[in-house]
């Protein structure tokens, strides 16, 4: 009779082979994250295993707000809504310094949700990374609406002492400076942020937003309709009716008539004079 160990040994090997990648993916994602902060809030471990530390700017720069704690956040996992419900803002520009020891490919993820204003053009600001503007005129409400999660995903490359982001290059000295820049409308803010090794494809996506997807589809349809109408207008312009006659062509014949009359009078007159 086969022993239990003999039977279960190969079975365990098969299970580890099949399930191993799934477990490795979850832990692998958290291992790629080198720095994460829950801005304006306490420490938190999300559903992907990413450990967000308590905000290091507490009591130093800006103000923490938990105003969003009373609101459900769309597009976010229920367990991770706290990452969008708390925030840090400041009446002037502010930011975080992130130490990076190794060169390579990185992704900076910035998390936002508008939990106060209920219309666009109320809070608009920029985001800079080491002096490079990576997000211009961010209007969270205009992007996704009220109490809805929004992530900005920014790939970064650090090689041979140079930082490359969105086509711009600068010298890198081991510190990534993420700055939220005050604009003309209210104060800059952030709900949470992290940086990880890898590419944008490695970043977990937010849940779909039916209303947002419908809006994007409508905008795409409008762009296509606009392009089609322009082509039709151009086509109609090519065949817009018969050509207008050239007015100068008729003027040539009218000029020739007096000349011919003059010749007709001059020749008989000359003939008569010669006979005299």
From Swiss-Prot:
Residues 27-253 are lumenal. Residues 229-247 have a biased composition (Polar residues). It is a single-pass type I membrane protein. Keywords: Carbohydrate metabolism, Endoplasmic reticulum, Glycoprotein, Membrane, Signal, Transmembrane, Transmembrane helix. GO terms for molecular function: carbohydrate binding. Widely expressed throughout development including the anterior neuroectoderm and neural crest at stages 18 and 20, and the retina, hatching gland, otic vesicle, epibranchial placodes, pronephros and tail tip of later states. At stage 41, expressed in the liver, pancreas, branchial arches and proctodeum. Expressed broadly in adults in fat, intestine, gall bladder, eye, muscle, kidney, stomach, liver, heart, pancreas and lung. Residues 204-247 are annotated as: Disordered. It is found in: Endoplasmic reticulum membrane. PANTHER family: MALECTIN, PTHR13460. This is Malectin-A. The lineage of its organism: Eukaryota, Metazoa, Chordata, Craniata, Vertebrata.
